[in-house]
């Protein structure tokens, strides 16, 4: 069992959060899992729909553009040839097969679990009390949001905030306060966070409810 301290809006310790040992259990080659997961995320963002027409697919007359002899020009067969404007493309991109990269749920959960555990072990994950997200700021105040980061000794660089989806109606004050800070990378919700968000973020501030929900989701089916 691992204990993490949680902080209130003023940087004071407000209790502890327990994490099961199964959360830190590593399955297989962890770095390879993370690499495969990130490659899948980045590859699947592409549409894979680039398609060009060759000379047999473009719409052109098959009539010769000019007579075979007597003009002084090189002989030409039709305007669909690639050297003409509007002609077919040679060796252009074609969606020949489904190029999306697939990764199963077990691998995805193991990769996210490894990334989160690394953030915890390097002291780059701060657990905030739920009141920080829901009750601390009723109106947007960037200065107060920055003061919270400094009071928790969070390095103001690449900070990702993660909250529980059930708080979406109540965290608008904090969310709007953070969007004007260059140090804040983004605002995500527990079950929607992916490995690319975690890799890109240098520091993470997560609410207690989001962390417990995420840990329960990621450790379901693992051996204690």
Swiss-Prot record:
InterPro entries: Ribosomal_uL4, Ribosomal_uL4-like, Ribosomal_uL4_dom_sf. Pfam families: Ribosomal_L4. Keywords: Ribonucleoprotein, Ribosomal protein, RNA-binding, rRNA-binding. GO terms for biological process: translation. GO terms for molecular function: rRNA binding; structural constituent of ribosome. GO terms for cellular component: ribonucleoprotein complex; ribosome. Gene3D superfamilies: 3.40.1370.10. Residues 54-73 are annotated as: Disordered. SUPFAM superfamilies: Ribosomal protein L4. Belongs to the universal ribosomal protein uL4 family. HAMAP family: Ribosomal_uL4_B. One of the primary rRNA binding proteins, this protein initially binds near the 5'-end of the 23S rRNA. It is important during the early stages of 50S assembly. It makes multiple contacts with different domains of the 23S rRNA in the assembled 50S subunit and ribosome. Forms part of the polypeptide exit tunnel. Part of the 50S ribosomal subunit. This is Large ribosomal subunit protein uL4. It comes from Chlamydia felis (strain Fe/C-56) (Chlamydophila felis).
């Amino acid at each position: 069992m691992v204990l993490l301290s949680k902080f209130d809006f003023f940087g004071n310790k407000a209790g502890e959060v327990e994490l099961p040992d199964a959360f830190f259990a590593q399955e297989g080659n962890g770095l390879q899992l993370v690499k495969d997961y990130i490659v899948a995320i980045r590859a699947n963002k592409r549409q894979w729909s680039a398609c060009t027409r060759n000379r047999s697919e473009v719409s052109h007359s098959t009539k010769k553009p000019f007579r075979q002899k007597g003009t002084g020009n090189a002989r030409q067969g039709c305007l669909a040839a690639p050297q003409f404007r509007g002609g077919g493309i040679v060796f252009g991109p074609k969606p020949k097969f489904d190029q999306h990269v697939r990764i199963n749920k077990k691998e995805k959960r193991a990769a996210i679990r490894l990334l989160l555990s690394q953030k915890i072990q390097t002291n780059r994950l701060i657990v905030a009390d739920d009141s920080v997200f829901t009750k601390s700021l009723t109106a947007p105040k960037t200065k107060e949001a920055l003061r919270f980061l400094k009071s928790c000794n969070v390095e103001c660089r690449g900070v990702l905030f993660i909250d529980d989806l059930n708080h979406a109606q109540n965290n608008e004050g904090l969310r709007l306060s953070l969007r004007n800070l260059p140090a804040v990378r983004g605002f995500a919700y527990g079950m929607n966070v992916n490995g690319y968000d975690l890799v890109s973020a240098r520091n993470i501030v997560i609410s207690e409810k989001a962390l417990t929900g995420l840990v329960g989701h990621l450790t379901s089916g693992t051996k204690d």
